[in-house]
Amino acid sequence: MALVTSFNMANPQPAIEGGISEVEIISQQVDEETKSIAPVQLVNFAYRDLPLAAVDLSTGGSQLLSNLDEEYQREGSDWLKPCCGKRAAVWQVFLLSASLNSFLVACVILVVILLTLELLIDTKLLQFSNAFQFAGVIHWISLVILSVFFSETVLRIVVLGIWDYIENKIEVFDGAVIILSLAPMVASTVANGPRSPWDAISLIIMFRIWRVKRVIDAYVLPVKLEMEMVTQQYEKAKAIQDEQLERLTQICQEQGFEIRQLRAHLAQQDLDLAAEREAALQAPHVLSQPRSRYKVVEAGTWAEETAAESIVEELRPSQEATVKDDMNSYISQYYNGPSSDSGAPEPAVCVVTTAAIDIHQPNVPSDLFSVDLPLKLSGNSTCASATSETTSHSTCGSVTRAQSASSQTLGSSTDCSTPREELLPSKPRSSPLPLLLPPQQLVAEATVQDLMSSLSKDPCPSHKALDPAPLAQPTPLGSVQTSPELEHRVSLFNQKNQEALPVLQINPVIHLQPTAGLEEKFRSLESKEPKLHTVPEA
């Protein structure tokens, strides 16, 4: 059983699927091992240690028989084998039984009483009629009882063995008492008959009264042995429980270590969740930052939308750059290049003063703004037109970039043959404008139409010379040729534009046309100024 237990401890069964814990499995193993422990049998006991109680012959008898045979073979006392053999165990159990010992004690008391009466009759201390006949009957009864005692002693010697019988001092004393009580009675009976005073020597048989102790032991020893067996079982169970306790303690320590690791992991996860929560709380502040109110909205493919958005990003003005919306600064830029205090980028080609009308947002006041529109134009009939919130692509392939101090950036490149309806971003091609519009939007529409009508007089403004001379003081009426200083400035300006953009073949933006009169140019621009700086009342 100990080997089985150690094997179970060395090779623990794996956890059964289905929710049964390892602790329950261990408890079940302990219960099974406790039930499988057989009760302790009365084996390998010496004669003086065996109880006098009734023993189960089916279990204890066969075990005693086998153990006695082994002991006889070991000690070499083989004289009992031919006589009794394996039946000696049955006789041993019978001789050690409590019933036999109780009967023997009763016989001892009876023979003592009979021998005492016989002694009183023989000494004539007790006289009554037929006393001598009664004394003879008592004599023969006492002789029979003493003969039974002698037979029991011989049976003990035969069953237990001469050497075991001699080793047990109490049994030797008991046998001596029986012989000393039986021998004088037999001798007196043979010599003198039943009437002999020597029969009183048989009273020595009263020393067999010690058999009472055997009777008491016959009832006490079974309980004692039973308690000893229970104690042994509990000791074995305690040893098993101690082993299981050590194992469970080890399992608890491992689980405690694992629990500490999991708690540390959960603490780290809590820190990560807290960091993510803080980031999520800061996200609305990032999303709520002000953005540009211009957004490219154009029906087309994804590539076109992406290109338009990239163009709008390029057209957004930098916050650091501050351009003075002044006509004098524009003129100084035409002649001298970008000024140091204007903050405009160097690759600016030209500046066109026009109106930027936010049609999509009617809440914005419809004041006119001056927009710096650096144009990069090629010579294959491309033109620039200022529109709001839209970038349109055309066959010319030119890109217009615009920057403004009012944070409104508009740019478009379109073909010269584009009709007037295509220049309006807020007006779809397939559907007309709604009939009922807000007043501010109507004002914006009217302003844009006026601007487009002024620009549509020349189908391609890029081919017409944009001469800054009318913006200055007018020259005398008869002068057709321009001054050499103005020609020099225009040539420097065109050369700078060509050097700044070496990739594109750019024709000079400003052409000096000697045939056109300066007064006519000034008059045409003067007629458009009220429309640029004032909003007509609708």
From Swiss-Prot:
The keyword Coiled coil applies. Disulfide bonds: none annotated. Residues 397-417 have a biased composition (Polar residues). Residues 381-396, 425-434 have a biased composition (Low complexity). GO terms for biological process: monoatomic ion transport; transmembrane transport. Residues 1-102, 152-169, 221-538 are cytoplasmic. Keywords: Cell membrane, Cell projection, Coiled coil, Disulfide bond, Membrane, Transmembrane, Transmembrane helix. Residues 124-130, 191-199 are extracellular. Pfam families: Ion_trans. Gene3D superfamilies: Voltage-gated potassium channels. Chain C. The transmembrane segment S4 functions as a voltage-sensor and is characterized by a series of positively charged amino acids at every third position. Transplantation of the transmembrane segment S4 into HVCN1, generates a functional voltage-activated proton channel. The coiled coil mediates homodimerization. This is Transmembrane protein 266. The gene is Tmem266.
